[in-house]
């Protein structure tokens, strides 16, 4: 029995990056031998075990064969006679198909096992598929796109790009389960350059199949005085990259991605203006979130940002009453943390524009001041003072908030 560290751990070590997680392959062993060494079985489709002390995952070397469309249509074979190279050949990219032997004390020993040229592709900054079996798993398209968001200087090798397009044309992407699509998109959004993920998906045609709402934004013009980059799709990519650069959370990045969906449905005769696109964005966003089973935290923030981002940009023109109405519509008084994230997404929208990346955004501070003032109003005390007139409480609290905001930010009520 031999144990090898494989995949991302070897890749990242060669790139001089921190190794976050290690995956292990065990060659020449049976499930019974693993159990005898106190490894705990956890795999459903094929034998995966947890180390008794470190709880890291160890998988028996295996081969796989495509039996049906989609992500789940595979048949696995594992036995002591499966070699390391047979296990590595089923992996997606050459840069992920390298290994090093692990000694009994856990140290990496010996040379890098690199049967498919992964080290050369690392030096050339190329994503290249290992073999023809790449086409058998549509998730690999999403993984390549996600890796592009992480390693933004890498390019997809031409032959790999051709295979990805062929997979899309064959309908393989349509068989992906929504949860897996969301999982890969979410992970890509959290990488350093998420726009690269969408560029790769768009180039192979997959974006139009899994996120047609985003694909439709490319080529849609905007007013150049507001958007020097003009193209709505380009703008959205700049927005998500700005959000990533700031280290914003996944809900903020998803809201940044989806805030302008309605611009794709603007009638041609009114372009490049987009009057009312906020409401159309909400109408498109709801079914998108349902289709991909987007988590509630991401969906709820995205809906607030899609509906209100235009108003958030205009707060310097608002009086106190309009500011309070905006805070109430956004449920900022009850959910101030979510509203803070809405301001982050709005700021990313304002700065995700060509030449305006560092433009001041005083709107955020104005709204933070307004929210502090509005939340300081003692609604309970007002309610007690109107104990016999409950119908008047809501309006009285609202008026008190307007007065507080007017005083705090120095605007008329």
UniProtKB/Swiss-Prot annotation:
Magnesium is required for nucleotidyltransferase activity. Nickel for phosphatase activity. Residues 232-333 form the HD domain. GO terms for molecular function: ATP binding; CCA tRNA nucleotidyltransferase activity; cyclic-nucleotide phosphodiesterase activity; magnesium ion binding; phosphatase activity; tRNA binding. InterPro entries: CCA_bact, HD_domain, NT_sf, PolA_pol_head_dom, PolyA_RNA-bd, tRNA_CCA-adding_enzyme. Keywords: ATP-binding, Hydrolase, Magnesium, Metal-binding, Multifunctional enzyme, Nickel, Nucleotide-binding, Nucleotidyltransferase, RNA repair, RNA-binding, Transferase, tRNA processing. Coiled coil: none annotated. It catalyses: a tRNA precursor + 2 CTP + ATP = a tRNA with a 3' CCA end + 3 diphosphate; a tRNA with a 3' CCA end + 2 CTP + ATP = a tRNA with a 3' CCACCA end + 3 diphosphate. Mg(2+) binds at residues 21, 23. Its EC number is 2.7.7.72, 3.1.3.-, 3.1.4.-. The keyword Transport does not apply. Its cofactor is Mg(2+); Ni(2+). Monomer. Can also form homodimers and oligomers. NCBIfam families: PRK10885.1. Comprises two domains: an N-terminal domain containing the nucleotidyltransferase activity and a C-terminal HD domain associated with both phosphodiesterase and phosphatase activities. Belongs to the tRNA nucleotidyltransferase/poly(A) polymerase family. Bacterial CCA-adding enzyme type 1 subfamily. A single active site specifically recognizes both ATP and CTP and is responsible for their addition. This is Multifunctional CCA protein.
């Amino acid at each position: 029995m031999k144990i090898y560290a494989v995949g991302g751990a070897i890749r990242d070590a060669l790139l001089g990056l921190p190794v976050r997680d290690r995956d292990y392959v065990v060659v020449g062993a049976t499930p019974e031998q693993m159990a005898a060494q106190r490894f705990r079985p956890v795999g459903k489709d094929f034998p995966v075990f947890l180390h008794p002390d470190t709880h890291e995952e160890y998988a028996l070397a295996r081969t796989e064969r495509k039996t049906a469309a989609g992500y789940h249509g595979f048949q696995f074979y594992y036995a002591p006679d499966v070699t390391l190279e047979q296990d590595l050949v089923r992996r997606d990219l050459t840069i992920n198909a390298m290994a090093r032997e692990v000694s009994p004390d856990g140290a990496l020993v010996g040379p890098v096992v690199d049967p498919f040229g992964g080290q050369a592709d690392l030096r050339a900054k190329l994503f290249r598929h290992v073999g023809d079996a790449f086409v058998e798993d549509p998730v690999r398209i999403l993984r390549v796109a996600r890796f592009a968001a992480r390693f933004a200087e890498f390019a997809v090798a031409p032959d790999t790009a051709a295979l990805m397009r062929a997979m899309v044309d064959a309908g393989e992407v349509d068989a992906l389960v929504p949860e897996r699509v969301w999982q890969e998109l979410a992970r890509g959004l959290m990488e350093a350059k998420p726009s690269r993920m969408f560029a790769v998906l768009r180039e192979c045609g997959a974006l139009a199949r899994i996120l047609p709402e985003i694909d439709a934004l490319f080529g849609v013009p905007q007013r150049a005085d507001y958007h020097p980059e003009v193209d709505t799709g380009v703008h959205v990519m700049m927005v998500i990259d700005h959000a990533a650069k700031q280290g914003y959370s996944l809900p903020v990045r998803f809201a940044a991605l989806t805030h302008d969906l309605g611009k794709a449905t603007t009638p041609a005769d009114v372009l490049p203006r987009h009057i009312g696109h906020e409401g159309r964005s909400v109408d498109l966003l709801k079914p998108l979130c349902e289709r991909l089973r987007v988590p509630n935290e991401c969906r709820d923030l995205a809906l607030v940002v899609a509906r209100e981002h235009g108003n958030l940009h205009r707060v310097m023109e608002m009086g106190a009453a309009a500011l309070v109405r905006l805070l109430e519509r956004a449920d900022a008084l009850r959910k101030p943390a979510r509203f803070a994230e809405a301001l982050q997404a709005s700021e990313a929208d304002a700065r995700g524009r060509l030449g305006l990346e560092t433009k001041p955004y005083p709107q955020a501070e104005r709204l933070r001041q307004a929210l502090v003032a509005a939340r300081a109003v003692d609604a309970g005390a007002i309610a007690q003072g109107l104990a016999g007139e409950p119908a008047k409480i809501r309006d009285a609290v609202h008026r008190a908030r307007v007065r507080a905001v007017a005083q705090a930010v120095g605007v008329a009520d």
